[in-house]
Amino acid sequence: MIALWWDEARQYNVLPLDDRGVTLFGIRPGDHGPHRLDRNYSYFPPITRIPTAASAPIGGRSWDFVAHIVRPAGSDGVLYATGTENSGLSIFIQNDLLVFDYNYFGEHWVAESTRPVPEGLCTVGVQFRRAKRDATVTLLINGEPSGDRHLPRFMRMMSSVGASVGFDDGSPVSDRYTGPFPFCGLIKRIDIRIVSQDKTSEQEANDATGRSIQARQ
C-alpha cells in the first residue's frame, strides 16, 4: 500500500511534499502583491472588508496609523477596525474625541484623545509600539501627541476575519457602539506603516499571521 501511494503521488505530480505548514501562509512582501517591500499600506474608501491575507499585518508588530479625513461638525464613527467582539481593535471618533479600543479577548483597554478632533480637513493617528510582552499606544491629532495608554499585553494574532475601513463590519469590536458605526465624514486616505523590529519578533508575528490565514482555509 505504501509503495502504491508513492507511485500514485509521482503519477499525479504530488511530489515533492512540502511540510512547511504555517510558513506557507505567512506574509511575504513583494512588489506584485498586497504586501509591499516598504511595508506601507494605503486605503482609499469606500472599500469592502479587506481579507486577512491582504490586510496590513499589525498583529504582534509595531505600527503607525494615519487617517486623512474631512470632519463635519459633530460627525462620529469608525475609521478602522479589525477583529470581532471576541478580540481585535477599533479606531474611531466619538463625542468629538479620537478613541482607540484594544479588545484583548473581551477585556477592553481604551485610550481617548486629550483634545477634540477638529472640524474640517485634519489627520488623526495612532502609534503602536510593542515591547517584549507589553505595548504603548499614542494618539495623535494633526501629528501632535494627544493621549496615550499602556497595554499590559498584546495579541500576536490580531484577527482571522480581516479589516474594515470607515465602518466596523460584523460583530462590533468595541462595546462603545453598536452596529457598523460608519464614519459620517469623509475619509480621504488611511495609511498604515509597519515599523521594523528584530527578526525574532517579526518571525513570531509572521507565524501568527500564517496560522490566522490557515485557519480560514
Q: Which ranges hold each PLM region?
A:
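Extracellular glycan-associated modules
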Residues: 16-217
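Sec-exported extracytoplasmic/periplasmic mature domains
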Residues: 6-10
